[in-house]
Amino acid sequence: MRNQSSLFVTAMLLGAVGLGACGTTPAEDRDRLTFPARQDFPVGVRGADTLSPGSRTYTFNPGLENSHLFVQIFSASLGHDHVVRATDWYGSIRFDPAKLEGCAISVTVSVEGLDPERDEMRDLMGQDRVSRSDRDQIREHLRGEDQLDLAKYDTIQFTSRSCELSSERGAGGYAQVVVHGDMTLRGSTREVSLPLEVAVDEERVAARGVLTARHQDFGFEPYSMLGGLFKNKDELYFVMDVRGERVPGK
């Protein structure tokens, strides 16, 4: 009986308590995505076209205030929605304002550093907090062989191929760049596109956008339990709301 009870509790946590985004479409789910730092996004100028010519490199810094990278996963059935914050990651962006299509962006995320259901993230999303022991249990399943499989694959990577300036501006009115590149997850690499709203000056950069991927594109199924009574949706929303600083001399 204890094992059955434990199984049910785990299902409630991973699929978890409430109706979440059950019945919503991917478009509706995207409207529910959370950007932590909407109010502080501006850093000084309106876009890359205002900068002096020449290549420059910025490094994204997870240690900077309001620099967040996380994954949102919505429930497909009974259960709550999940937020998984990346606590160990790094990335960079290099571009020349006169040759934006030649930009180079890379981001590497440590799977071991993915921390689910942190208090500040659940507060941000307006969801009830999860106990420490329950978070640990969710983290264990997230790293499991049927999910991210940490034992075999310790990083998630994105590397750009090209960039293009969009005719549309982002939600904050800043220039939007569509970054085409390759994403590697669980050892599988797929071509993806990442629309990024970018504010930048000579010393700092802020970028925010959502990369949408699907479990099945990378060879695994969304977490499911009790015959699908508790199940996550196929879509994985990698939310970037990040800050960076220019590399001295570059």
PLM region descriptions:
Residues 1-9:
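Bacterial N-terminal signal peptides that target proteins for export
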Residues 10-20:
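Bacterial N-terminal signal peptides
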Residues 22-250:
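Low-complexity, acidic/polar, glycine-enriched regions of mature
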